[in-house]
Amino acid sequence: MTAKTAITALLLAALPAGSAMAVTVAEARGRVVRETMTFLNTPYLWGGMHPETGMDCSAFTKLVYEKAGLNLPRVSAEQFSRTLRLAPSDVRPGDLIFFAMKHPGTSRVDHVGIYVGKGFFVHASFTNGVHIDSVTNPYYYARLVSVRKYAGF
């Protein structure tokens, strides 16, 4: 076994099951958007983490990213702090969009969704479960804190 083969074998062994070694940014973003759509109509459950019994907003984003081979923290405020800020004009499908639902007009993040393009995002809300909304909806727009991207996107 050559040194290169041995190193490759070690690297592959260290990857989580189902991971691809060389995934392009476009492929990763595409996976995030595709996975996002598979959870539409999942019920909302605060603190919930399973699509059959219900999940909250940050469990939804964590699970979507996980299924796309990416790791996010469990809580929306931690997801916010571990991602990179974007100018609104730079947002792309697969990016995260953060809100201050309980304290509009502040930067106290307590809600997160995934931008899917053309002004729309998918999120888990108390009233509708996982569904699509418009960023320009006055209710959400007034509570928008930031759009952010996963490091490497």
Each model region followed by its residue ranges:
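Aromatic- and glycine-rich peptidoglycan recognition patches
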Residues: V23-R34, T42, M49, L70, ...
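Sec/Tat signal peptide C-region and signal peptidase I cleavage site
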Residues: G18-A22
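Secreted/periplasmic proteins that engage bacterial cell-wall peptidoglycan
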Residues: T36, T42-R74
